[in-house]
């Protein structure tokens, strides 16, 4: 048998997309935020797709990793199945919390949720795997008993030291 043939050099199959420039903007109450499907972003087609969905101007807050995030000015309509598959979560920011997310601070997050009539809060932020299920369970128990009518998710601001509570559309 002959030794394997090794070809060096050449171009990568797909050039990395350079137009997903992350910008630091401080999110504010009333802004919209969406977590985009990571595979769509990795494919390099995210910006082309975002231009077709009528969300107005948008800014990449995080374009890498498991939770690519954009801030945008208009609500995203997710009733179409194609849309729902490409947007993991979308909502309007109702509160920014300047605290670490720990078991000790969970009550502060719950109180803020109650002020906004939130009955379910899903954590969509990277946390220590040992504490995440405990925190999620604490949120579920405390909020379910209070009968809030809205669903929300919790994100960590990728460029800041705060958490965003976002009410789902």
State the predicted function of each range:
Residues 1-169:
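Class I S-adenosyl-L-methionine
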């Amino acid at each position: 048998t002959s030794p394997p043939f090794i070809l060096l050099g050449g171009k990568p199959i797909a050039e990395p997309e350079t137009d997903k420039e992350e910008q630091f903007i401080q999110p504010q109450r009333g802004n919209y935020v969406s977590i985009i499907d990571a595979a769509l972003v990795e494919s390099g087609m995210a910006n082309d797709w975002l231009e077709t969905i009528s969300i107005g101007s948008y800014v990449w807050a995080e374009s890498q990793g498991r939770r690519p995030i954009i801030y945008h000015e208009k609500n995203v309509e997710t009733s179409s199945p194609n849309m729902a598959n490409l947007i993991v979560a979308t909502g309007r920011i109702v509160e920014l919390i300047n605290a670490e997310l720990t078991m000790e601070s969970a009550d502060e997050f719950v109180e803020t949720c109650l002020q906004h009539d939130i009955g379910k809060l899903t954590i969509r932020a990277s946390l220590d795997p040992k504490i995440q299920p405990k925190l999620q369970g604490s949120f579920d128990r405390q909020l379910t008993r209070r009968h809030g009518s809205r669903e929300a998710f919790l994100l960590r601001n990728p460029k800041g030291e705060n958490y965003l509570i976002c009410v789902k559309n």
